[in-house]
């Protein structure tokens, strides 16, 4: 992702009936991760106008989450929503926080910038893969959502570039 915006933008939100923050990555100037409505402040920013490879992993067995920026672990904690299961059947939206399923968008929470190669897996990727992905534009394809799934649901003031505009991060 790349952004120089100063608003509390939302790269990713997944909402269900009854839980609008089932899975949310919010506020790229001081990231928050929300799972099942519970919030963890990451305290890492990515709104400096440069490309950043952002990856978040979470293991529900022990509640361990990891926040990677450009292939490096910036924050890791355990016991966050341990035993919780993210429910299927929701709506995933890139670039907006959903205050109700598929809507309730607030302009102040919209993502302003460029996103590329967004993928979602049902398992925790190995650190080695995350590091490799951060150094190339070949991110593989998520088994829940892959980047190409998003091009058909584009709405609003969104432009799709094909091929994508990914720039490798050189750490």
Label each PLM-derived region with a short phrase.
Residues 1-171:
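Extracellular glycan-associated modules
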């Amino acid at each position: 992702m790349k952004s120089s915006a100063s608003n509390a933008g939302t790269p990713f939100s997944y909402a269900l009936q009854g839980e609008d923050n089932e899975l949310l990555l919010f506020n790229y100037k001081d990231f928050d991760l929300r799972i099942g409505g519970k919030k963890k402040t990451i305290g890492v920013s990515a709104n400096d106008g440069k490309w950043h490879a952002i990856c978040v992993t979470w293991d529900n067995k022990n509640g361990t989450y990891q926040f990677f920026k450009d292939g490096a672990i910036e924050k890791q904690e355990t016991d966050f929503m341990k035993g919780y299961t993210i429910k299927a059947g929701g709506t995933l939206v890139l670039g907006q926080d959903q205050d109700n399923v598929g809507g309730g968008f607030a302009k102040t929470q919209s993502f302003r910038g460029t996103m590329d190669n967004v993928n979602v897996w049902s398992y925790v990727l190995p650190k080695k893969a995350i590091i490799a992905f951060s150094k190339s534009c070949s991110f593989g394809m998520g088994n829940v959502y892959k980047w190409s799934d998003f091009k058909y649901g584009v709405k609003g003031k969104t432009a799709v570039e094909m091929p994508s505009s990914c720039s490798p991060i050189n750490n």
